[in-house]
Each structure stands twice: as structure tokens, then as C-alpha cells.
């Protein structure tokens, strides 16, 4: 299991009481707007919109905010911005490769925010292509464990193209090719299994094992990057042991 998955799980548990909740809501709303603009407002014909709405609902974003975001994205309500996706590449402390996915209406602001966060937290920017080759784009579906076993999940998703099921503690992570993600999510739904999120992520092909000090440094960098309103996702190729994670969480 990747260190970043553990970190994301830890943050997920804290999300409801986290001081950044408003910032999280804004990013989820932005996802919905962009999905509606690019694929239309009808969820039946827009699986990306379905998944953006699902993730927002699971994070307790109010329904009225979700509905407004869909309307803005579809041009049915004023106020929508023209967002573009930009990927930045860099290295964090201990040579950890970092991919930063931005969704922004101001390219210069996004670039500045990312550069400042990187340089102030032991990181450095890298040329396009110098880091991204260390990652593969995969479909990742996160589902609450509840009473489910790993075999329950495997039985539901194996024929839909799932490559692996990872136990993240309180959740399961189902990994597939990005093109198979909707089929995996649909298979879970048909089996009556609820899911928290389904999205295409960049997963590392190799990982850097970090000790407690290294873990704290990379988490500080990720936090600084995610503080930017323009940064939607941060992907990194590090791993930490359960023992180290417990110390960091303490």
C-alpha cells in the first residue's frame, strides 16, 4: 500500500473537523463544474460528473451547492469560471518524485503557488516528463469497509477489469486501468456495494521508503501544496511503514 494512500486515509478521517474543510468543499465543487462543462449536465451520459458528485456528497458538501455547481458548469447559471488542467512536476525531500495536478483559471497564479510551496518545503521544480514517467494513470475506487471482506470486493470487481484490491484500514482501494474505472464502479453498485470516490489517479511504479523525519517532511510539502486553491491533487512516489505512520499520527 502506498504511503500516499495511508496519508490520504488519515486526512479523510479528519476531514469533517479539519480547518481546511471550506477549501476541500471548493475543490470538490470545482471538480463538478469542470465535469459538467466538459461532459454535459446529464449524469446518465457523464460518468465523470457522477463520480464528482458522489465524492462531494461523501464529503458532506450540501446538495444545493452541488446543484449550483452542475448548473454553472452547464452554463445554466452565471458565475462559472473557465478552468484548465495543468500538471507540474518536481522533487520533494529525499528525492521523492511529485506530480501536482492543478485546476485553475489563472495559470500564472497556479505556477507561482506551486513553485513557492515547493521551494519553501525542501522541494524543487522539474522539467516536464522528468518525473511523470515514474507514474501510471490508474482508476482508483475507494469504498468503506464496513462488514465487507476483501473476497467480497474481489468477487464483485474481478470480471470488470480490477487489477488489485488494497486494504487501507477503514477502506478498500480498488485499482484498475483508468479506462476500466467506470466498469469497476458499476460492478460494485450492481453488487450493492457503496463507494466513496472513483477517479483517475497517478500511481507510482516505484517508491522511496521514508523514515519518520522523511515522512514528516513530505507530508509538510503536500500540505503546503494542497493549501493552494488551484491544486486539486498531489501524487508522490513514497512509502512509509505502519510503524512510522503511527508515530506521525501521534
Swiss-Prot record:
GO cellular component: cytosol
Keywords: Cytoplasm, DNA-binding, Transcription, Transcription regulation
InterPro entries xref list: Integrase-like_N (IPR017856), TACO1_YebC-like_2nd/3rd_dom (IPR048300), TACO1_YebC_N (IPR049083), Transcrip_reg_TACO1-like (IPR002876), Transcrip_reg_TACO1-like_dom3 (IPR026564), YebC-like (IPR029072)
Cited Pfam families: TACO1_YebC_N, Transcrip_reg
Location of the protein in the cell: Cytoplasm
Gene3D superfamilies listed in its UniProt record: 1.10.10.200, 3.30.70.980
GO biological process, one term: regulation of DNA-templated transcription
Cytoplasm as UniProt keyword: yes
Molecular-function GO terms, alphabetical: DNA binding
NCBIfam families reported for this sequence: PRK00110.1, PRK12378.1, YebC/PmpR family DNA-binding transcriptional regulator
Family, as annotated: Belongs to the TACO1 family.
Protein name per its UniProtKB record: Probable transcriptional regulatory protein SGR_6014
Amino acid at each position: 500500500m502506498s504511503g500516499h494512500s495511508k496519508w490520504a486515509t488519515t486526512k479523510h478521517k479528519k476531514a469533517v473537523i479539519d480547518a481546511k474543510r471550506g477549501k476541500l468543499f471548493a475543490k470538490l465543487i470545482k471538480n463538478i463544474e469542470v465535469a459538467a462543462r466538459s461532459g454535459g449536465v446529464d449524469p446518465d451520459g457523464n460518468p465523470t460528473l457522477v463520480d464528482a458528485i458522489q465524492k462531494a456528497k461523501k464529503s458532506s458538501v450540501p446538495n444545493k451547492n452541488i446543484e449550483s455547481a452542475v448548473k454553472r458548469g452547464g452554463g445554466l447559471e452565471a458565475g462559472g469560471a473557465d478552468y484548465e488542467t495543468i500538471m507540474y512536476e518536481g522533487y520533494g525531500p529525499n528525492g521523492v518524485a511529485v506530480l501536482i495536478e492543478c485546476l485553475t483559471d489563472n495559470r500564472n497564479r497556479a505556477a507561482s503557488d506551486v513553485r513557492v510551496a515547493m521551494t519553501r518545503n525542501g522541494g524543487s521544480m522539474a522539467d516536464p516528463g522528468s518525473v511523470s514517467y515514474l507514474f501510471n494513470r490508474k482508476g482508483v475506487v475507494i469504498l468503506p469497509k464496513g462488514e465487507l471482506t476483501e473476497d467480497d470486493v474481489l468477487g464483485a470487481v474481478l470480471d470488470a477489469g480490477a487489477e488489485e484490491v488494497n486494504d487501507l484500514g477503514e477502506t478498500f482501494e480498488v485499482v484498475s486501468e483508468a479506462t476500466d474505472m467506470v466498469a469497476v464502479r458499476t460492478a460494485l453498485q450492481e453488487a450493492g456495494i457503496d463507494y466513496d470516490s472513483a477517479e483517475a489517479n497517478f500511481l507510482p511504479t516505484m517508491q522511496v521508503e521514508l523514515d519518520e523525519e522523511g515522512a514528516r517532511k513530505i507530508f509538510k510539502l503536500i500540505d503546503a501544496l494542497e493549501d493552494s486553491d488551484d491544486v486539486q491533487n498531489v501524487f508522490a512516489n513514497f512509502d512509509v511503514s505502519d510503524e512510522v505512520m503511527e508515530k506521525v499520527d501521534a
